[in-house]
Swiss-Prot record:
Domain GRAM: start-end pairs: 196-235, 586-652
Listed InterPro entries: ATG26_PH_GRAM1, ATG26_PH_GRAM2, EryCIII-like_C, Glycosyltransferase_28, GlycoTrans_28_N, GRAM, PH-like_dom_sf, PH_domain
Domain PH: 248-347
An annotated Gene Ontology molecular function: sterol 3-beta-glucosyltransferase activity
Tree of life domain: Eukaryota
Function: Sterol glycosyltransferase responsible for the glycosylation of ergosterol to form ergosterol-glucoside. Shows also activity in vitro on other sterols such as cholesterol, beta-sitosterol, stigmasterol and tomatidine. Probable sterol 3-beta-glucosyltransferase that mediates autophagic degradation of peroxisomes (pexophagy).
Protein name: Sterol 3-beta-glucosyltransferase
PANTHER family: STEROL 3-BETA-GLUCOSYLTRANSFERASE (PTHR48050:SF25)
Length: 1211
């Protein structure tokens, strides 16, 4: 894959890539698809060289320089050019959806690109190369004759331009690989297809002529990567938009402002996906949004106060036609992230065609100017007459990092050929419109009279709030902020709304949908009225009751009769009036914020059975069934995809005379609906089953293709990671200029732009504990290595060979994991006895751990630590580097879960859960504070600290657990993420060779028809291994199953006296077997409940039995019971284990639920999600570390409240 490289200032020489390891703003942008990255049919844009700023990002005084260079560097290298090939690919997309286009592209390497750009040779004119291209024109003519098509003037101009560029590229690079004057058949065909696509997209005539094309960025409320095409009559702009309808771009908890108290007292889970923004009651809810906003009709999104402190809660607002919604994020950075992503989605939603096209007749251009807004960029400003009738003038801004002057010259020459006279001036009067600071540039003004109006095929919508305000104001706001980063630009809001939504006539009983606001207060009537509360309520109830009864027993309404046509029957419920059907379709999409492709098939009035029957209406669409309540005071909305429905069946209603319908949902409780008649219920059942059959057949047809496509996606190429990298650079720019800068890169099926940081961060992963604590970090390290970063794992010496076998750097810290585990198993949870023994055995070890951790982590750029390691937060404070925590058990204050070391026997509510975290934090800090503060003063040269100043609850936290098992709590702040398991697959077919006796044992169990169960408690230390082994043997024989046994408990610090227990033939002693290889081949698993083992079991989709010994194992024993996939054993003996094994191997409900949970976990990529969060929260983490140093700099005395030496015993 070719890589864009900076060019040297000396002409005629191509430069080698410069080392930019210490510059986080430097990026690579690669093009995927086509050939080696440069799939363009025309001149590729190359990045102008920028001197490296090695340490500038850490210098506060260089903020403005950093802002300019970071934005310039990023957008420059992102201006790769794939537009022509994309247009070509898109032209034949309909005929080749499943396979890439068989295309052998122009073999142009990076050196040829660099040479052409360095010498700065302008494009050769058609007349200069006519002799060279005649053979190619003859070949094209022959091709067209064969296709029975006459060669047009426009096609000739495209081929001539292509030959000229090949000639220039070959001469400047000195390449001898091909004749630079020759086009092969593939390129000739490609040029013809390009002509057809341009003519179709922009409605060009055959008499038009192609002049040139250039990569550029459209400056609007977003920075949109695209391409300008210049013809003899038009200036054309084209950009593909990313298609992310099925991907959740952003999610997290937000506070909502109450309309009555005006306080942000309610937390909801927000999801931004495709064209909608929805709020749910919690992170596990998927079908019942409490708020549903269609982004196509959103007018504006902005921060309410962008000048707040960094880590203070920040309010942003969404303005719709009906009301303004206020949301509070946990910090300014988080609010900016929401605003930036919302603006991108709004822009994409309002340009639903998948691309943005602008067509400007050259005759309508009133003014041209090139302005240098900041270093290494040129901005082309166009003043264009919109129409002769309105005489409105539009401003368009296009940013170039190369060839800006050439673009201006090309436009001038084309206009001159049309007889439009131009004059030059040193600077345009409108230069100051873009920025308050001085700009250098040249301007061209019209003298001739206009003769035709501007034509825009797919224009940027105008007049829709600040998102789609006139481009002049949006561009000036962004660029003005770049020029003056210390000042916050104010953005005007236009109240003009172009979108008109029809009224809904079937919602007399309530307001529209969750996204709408209450009606404005009416003015009080001047007429006297005689009424009482009793009469008013009686009248209201009687009216609504009569309406409800009449609507409930109304007949179904069909809006598509294809089902009855296929059956050869007449549809008695079909709405024959076309206008009524169109209005109903519009209402349906509006209510549930559905795309235009969603079609309403039928609708029914019914009751939805929740706590009480809720009257409403069911809608059957092409891909989902929807419901909305119609009774006053209720606000229930449901959007349920057919793909999540397992079955539908009929039953009697709960009330006399009603007919019931049950919808069975995968991994969710059943839904009950009551209809007023059997006819309506049966009709709904018929339509539902038909759509389910269609959905399943369609899904099966594409499942194999989807699987192959997913298998080919690498970690570094995932959409989520690409978005995270882009968001990281956006965050840096926003932090510098104090304004949101949404950047949209082009993307289509065959070619996408990818941003990568050129700086290789040194990630240090610090952890202590057992093998299960180290294994996830190896998986994360592999992902970071794939991202081209450097990684070092710091842990106990015994894991060194294992870690280094993956090519990961290793460093040692103090401590014996077996002794730590023995302490934990002995005391199980936090207690006085635990503290006493810890004081006796580990007081000296804490000092050794802190010192060895500091020695191993001093070269870190980013530090990720298990909080049990204790040293990381202090090391990050000293080094002023981003610091993250990662763990497998609850460690963050929340009301949803107790602390993993203080899990009660039974659930005791949110207040108790929150209290367990407070208690543990204080006890844990009291136990280590003495050693820690001594180490801080003597080694780190930092002042003493206390629990408050540590600000542990503000540290970005990554939970490497599946959100299916550990759903994010609503009171988690935005920097606490549940990313998914970090699996380390060691048992793949090419890396693990199972012993033959194990395979024979498994095959015999299958032949005998016996369930196969795995039993192993990892590296747990137990006091009496023999007794535990005997209990396992008795339980296996009693349950009549076959067992694969891993007796790890007898190998570590156990009593080695006595004779080893002999195992019966029903049990095979396997030792360590890779879980990813084994668990997919058995029926159930019994283990200790470690996070890694639990995750591997659940991913395999098999039931699990957990016997917890200490720590988070009690937590996961409760979780597997809560989600219905297994059993937690508080006490293990032969009887209890036998009963549990029988239950999980025979209970169909547990088995099916485990399979469903397994599918969900298999669809997750925890490592990819973790790296995405690292990018997203990197800037926040760095600010947090630096803020502590600023605090100490402002303190004149030690604030530590630890007057006595803290220890493990003094609490």
């Amino acid at each position: 894959m070719s890589q864009l490289r900076p060019r040297d200032s000396s002409a005629g020489k191509s430069s080698s890539p410069r080392r930019t390891d210490r510059n986080p703003e430097s990026i690579d942008v690669n093009s995927k698809g086509g050939s080696e990255g440069m799939t363009s049919g025309l001149v590729p844009g190359t990045a102008p060289h920028k001197e490296d700023e090695t340490e500038a990002e850490d210098d506060i005084d260089c903020g403005r320089l950093i802002t300019s260079k970071s934005l310039a560097t990023m957008l420059t290298t992102a201006s790769m050019y794939a537009g022509v090939s994309q247009l070509d690919d898109d032209a034949i997309e309909s005929s080749a959806l499943d396979e890439p286009i068989p295309y052998v592209p122009y073999e142009e390497d990076a050196e040829s690109v660099m040479s052409e750009s360095t010498v700065g040779v302008d494009t050769v004119r058609d007349t200069d190369s006519s002799e060279q291209i005649n053979p190619e024109i003859d070949g094209l003519v022959a091709l067209r004759k064969k296709q029975q098509h006459t060669l047009s003037k426009f096609e000739l101009s495209v081929v001539r331009k292509r030959c000229s560029q090949l000639s220039l590229a070959g001469s400047s690079s000195g390449s001898t690989r091909r004749n630079s004057f020759t086009l092969d058949n593939n390129e000739t065909t490609r040029a013809v297809k390009l002509c057809e696509k341009l003519k179709t997209t922009f409605d060009l005539s055959d008499d038009d002529e192609f002049v040139n094309d250039y990569p550029c960025w459209l400056l609007h409320e977003v920075f949109l990567q695209g391409h300008i095409y210049i013809t003899s009559r038009y200036l054309l702009y084209f950009a593909f938009l990313p298609k992310r309808d099925s991907t959740v771009t952003m999610s997290g908890a937000l506070s909502i402002r109450s309309s009555t108290t005006m306080r942000f007292s309610v937390r909801r889970w927000a999801v931004l996906k495709g064209n909608y923004f929805r709020l749910y009651a919690n992170s596990t809810e998927r079908y019942f949004p409490s708020l549903n906003i269609d982004l196509r009709f959103l007018l504006k999104v902005e921060l309410s106060n962008p000048n707040l402190e960094e880590n203070k809660p920040t309010v942003f607002k969404l303005i719709t036609e009906a009301r303004t919604h206020y949301f509070q994020a946990d910090s300014l950075d988080n609010a900016r992230s929401w605003v930036t992503d919302l603006r991108k989605h709004i822009f994409t939603a309002k340009n639903s065609g998948g691309h943005v096209t602008i067509k400007v007749p050259l005759e309508n251009i009133l003014d041209l100017s090139i302005e240098t807004l900041f270093e290494a960029s040129q901005t082309l400003k166009l003043k264009v007459l919109e129409s002769e009738e309105s005489y409105a003038i539009d401003d368009y801004y296009f940013m170039f990092f190369n060839n800006g002057d050439q673009v201006l010259d090309s436009i001038r020459q084309s206009m001159k050929a049309l007889g439009i006279e131009l004059t030059d001036s040193d600077s345009s009067e409108s230069d100051s419109d873009v920025s308050g600071s001085e700009t250098n540039g040249r301007s061209t003004h019209r003298k001739s009279k206009l003769s035709r109006s501007l034509s825009v095929l797919t224009p940027i919508p105008r007049g829709i709030g600040s998102i789609y305000k006139p481009i002049k104001s949006s561009a000036s706001g962004i660029i003005g902020a770049i020029k003056k980063p210390q000042k916050s630009a104010t953005r005007p809001f236009s109240s003009v709304v172009e979108t008109v939504v029809p009224n809904d006539n079937d919602s007399e009983l309530k307001q529209d949908h969750a996204g709408d606001a209450p009606k404005d207060s009416e003015e009080p009537s001047t007429k006297p009225s005689n009424w009482s509360a009793k009469s008013l309520v009686q009248g209201f109830l009687s009216t609504t009751s009569s309406i409800s009864q009449s609507m409930l027993f109304a007949s179904p309404m069909h809006y598509n009769n294809q089902l009855f046509i296929e059956r050869g029957e007449e549809d008695p419920y079909f709405v024959t009036n076309k206008e009524e059907r169109e209005v109903a379709q519009s209402r349906f999409r509006k209510h549930f914020s559905l795309p235009d492709s969603e079609e309403l098939l039928a609708s029914y009035f019914c009751h939805f059975q929740k706590n009480i029957p809720v009257y409403g209406k069911v809608y059957l669409g092409t891909t989902c069934i929807c419901y909305r309540s119609l009774f006053p005071g209720t606000n229930t909305t449901m959007i349920l995809p057919y793909s999540d429905i397992e079955n539908v069946y009929n039953l009697k209603g709960f009330r006399f005379g009603y007919s019931g319908l049950v919808i069975v949902i995968r991994a969710h409780e059943e839904l009950f609906f009551e209809f007023g008649s059997n006819e309506s219920r049966d009709d709904c059942d018929l339509f539902l089953l038909k759509q389910l059959d269609f959905t399943k057949s369609h899904k099966n047809a594409h499942s194999e293709q989807k699987r192959k496509r997913n298998d080919s996606i690498k970690l570094a190429e995932s959409v989520q990671l690409a978005d995270a990298r882009l968001r990281y650079f956006e965050t840096r720019i926003e932090s510098d200029i104090g304004r949101e800068v949404p950047i949209i890169l082009e993307e289509n099926q065959y070619s996408t732009s990818e941003i990568r940081s050129k700086r290789r961060y040194k990630f240090v992963l610090l952890t202590i504990g057992s093998r299960g604590d180290v294994q996830p970090y190896i998986s994360l390290a592999k992902g970071l290595l794939a991202e081209n970063h450097k990684v070092k794992i710091v842990t106990h010496e015994e894991f060194k060979p294992w870690v280094e076998s993956y090519g990961i750097e290793f460093a040692t810290i103090a401590g014996n994991p077996a002794e730590l585990m023995s302490l934990m198993v002995t005391h199980k949870s936090l207690s006085v006895g635990f503290l006493k023994e810890a004081k006796e055995k580990f007081t000296g070890w804490i000092g050794e751990l802190l010192q060895s951790s500091w020695d191993a982590c001093q070269d870190a750029d980013v530090l990720i630590e298990s909080p049990s390691a204790m040293a990381g937060i202090h090391i990050a404070e000293k080094l002023q580097i981003p610091y993250f925590r990662a763990f497998t058990m609850p460690w963050t204050r929340t009301r949803a879960y107790p602390h993993a070391f203080v899990v009660p026997e039974q659930k005791r509510g949110g207040s108790y859960n929150y209290l367990t975290h407070i208690i543990f934090e204080n006890v844990f800090w009291k136990g280590i504070s003495g050693e820690v503060n001594k180490w801080r003063e003597q080694v780190l040269m930092l002042p003493k600290t206390n629990l408050e100043r540590l600000e542990q609850n503000k540290v970005p936290f990554l939970y490497n657990v599946s959100p299916t098992v550990f759903p994010p709590s609503m009171d988690f702040p935005h920097w606490v993420k549940v990313v998914g398991y970090w699996f380390l697959d060691e048992g793949e077919a090419d890396s693990y060779d199972p012993p033959k006796p194990l395979l024979e044992f498994m095959e015999k169990a299958k032949t005998d028809g016996k369930k196969l169960v795995y039993i192993g408690f990892g590296s747990i230390v137990v006091s009496d291994p023999k007794q535990l082994t005997e209990a396992v043997i008795d339980a296996v024989l009693s349950a009549d199953v076959r067992c694969i046994l891993n007796k790890g408990w007898s190998d570590r610090l156990g009593k080695q006296t006595g004779v080893e227990v002999e195992l019966p033939e029903e049990i095979y002693n396997s030792g360590n077997v890779p879980h990813d290889w084994l668990f997919g081949k058995i029926d159930a698993s019994v283990h200790h409940g470690g996070s890694g083992t639990t995750g591997a079991t659940l991913r395999a989709g098999i039931p699990t039995i957990i016997k917890p010994f200490f720590g988070d194992q009690f937590f996961y024993a409760n979780r597997v019971e809560d989600i219905g996939v297994g059993i937690g054993l508080r006490k293990l003996n032969s009887k209890s284990l036998s009963k549990a094994i029988k239950e999980v191997t025979t209970n169909t409900r547990i088995i099916e639920k485990a399979k469903e949970i397994g599918k969900q976990i298999q669809s997750e990529n925890g490592v990819s999600a973790a790296i995405r969060c690292l990018y997203q929260e990197m800037e926040y983490a760095k600010k947090l570390s630096k803020s502590k140093q600023k605090y100490w700099d402002n303190q004149s005395e030690d604030i530590s409240d630890d007057s006595v030496s803290g220890s493990w015993f003094e609490v």
